[in-house]
Amino acid sequence: MELKAMYLYAAVLAVLLCSSVNFIQSPTDVLGPVALLEPTPSSARDFGAVVSDAPFAVMRPESPDDIALLLGALSSTAPSPRATVAAVGAGHSLHGQAQARDGIVVETRALPRDVHVVSARAHGGDDDATVRAYADVGAGALWVEVLEECLKLGLAPPSWTDYLYLTVGGTLSNGGISGQTFKHGPQISNVLQLEVVTGKGEVVTCSPTEIPELFFAVLGGLGQFGIITRARIPLQLAPPKVRWVRAFYDSFETFTGDQELLVSMPEQVDYVEGFMVLNEQSLHSSSVAFPAQLNFSPDFGSKGRKKVYYCIEFAVHDFQQDSSRADHVVKLVSAKLSYLRPHVYSVEVSYFDFLNRVRMEEESLRSRGLWDVPHPWLNVFVPKHGITQFKGLLMDTVSADDFEGPILVYPLLTDKWDGNTSAVVPAAPDGVMYIFGVLRSTDPARCGRACVDSIMARHRRVADEACRDGGGGGRGIGAKQYLARQPSPARWRDHFGAGWGRFAARKARFDPLHVLGPGQGIFPRTDSAGSM
């Protein structure tokens, strides 16, 4: 290990002492057993495809110890401002958050991706014992890999993201939300233990009771305090199948009212989401994964006025062979909803296919050349009182004629979010907030760089207006952005609000030289602890 550390130390010094502009020697020539590799074009690319900051080198660690050696060397050599490190998983950041200009990118997919399931049922056999089941997971594992392994024992994590081809460490560094969040909370509220390499190069095991400050800091911490290398995730019984329901609306108020009714029934309903239907294309693309015939032919504006429709989707887990209970629940729940009669549709699918539904949408977009394209997305948490105002702001910037992609709208309950984590949600006096997710794909043939920049500028104006505090008679809504990169450190302080002091104190404790997470743009690199 000492020899390995010496090789890495020399490599790090080469990074520190040489400019990315005039550096001639390849990093692979000076390394030894811990390799820093030449960057490739993919090292400066992410799913958003709107920011491209090339690193100096790439690390593919074999173990957390490799990362610890790297960060330990960087934190002990009074490095230059360029010596930063970003962790990247599946590369699904939207605004370059997992990039490190002239720094080092650590590819966590190179770490062991094992999924080890421990089930208390093997010792007890009663259903209550499954609450104590968990999976120890390498942070570079994809959630779909976790699902596949857990289902072998009839188990699954309770909380998900819509898209499963994301890494465990990546979503836990942000939040992790989907239609189960109203019931179980986000993924960051469903973690028992973490292994983390801090910005000082320390490998630490932490939990709500063991070094809790680090545990809660890294959950939703945007990669600022440490790199998650393992996670222990609680498991529950997985249903063999799911009854999946969609209902259509032509009134935003009725649509959101019914969503709030659904999330008030967690004993009956297991998943609630919804989306706006702007045009024929959005109706078609949102139906790709839904394996039922939709006899819904809305009028989007043939009478001269644009009309927007809405769709609620909810799901009921089905543990019975004959599906009678799930069908009964769906019938009772649907009877309470005020959808456009008769436009409610129900289908039975396997639990795996339901959770993996976005994969079909991905394949459809790939076939049309609309997956590896710029994605100028906008995700905003909006308190319930501001959703109508926010929808108005949003629709002023969206053209229904050519919009490509879903606009998600569904409620979340703020009491399901642990306030000890680093995640930021808006103040919602009634405990209800909505996620608005504008998940746009841009066709390069019709929308070049100037067009993408224009979309992002419009999104910034919407976010600025919505995130202003509405107190004192102001027009602001008090919303909070999600998965976004703020334009300056000052704007990050505004984003965190009263939580900024705690966030900054955690940074000073676990990454005092500001080595980690440069792509977020929160903390400029410093040469000494405590300076900015």
Curated annotation (Swiss-Prot):
Catalytic activity: N(6)-dimethylallyladenine + A + H2O = 3-methyl-2-butenal + adenine + AH2
Signal peptide stretch: 1-26
Glycosylation sites: N420
Main location: secreted
Similarity annotation: Belongs to the oxygen-dependent FAD-linked oxidoreductase family.
Assembly: Monomer.
Protein's recorded name: Cytokinin dehydrogenase 8
Species this chain originates from: Oryza sativa subsp. japonica
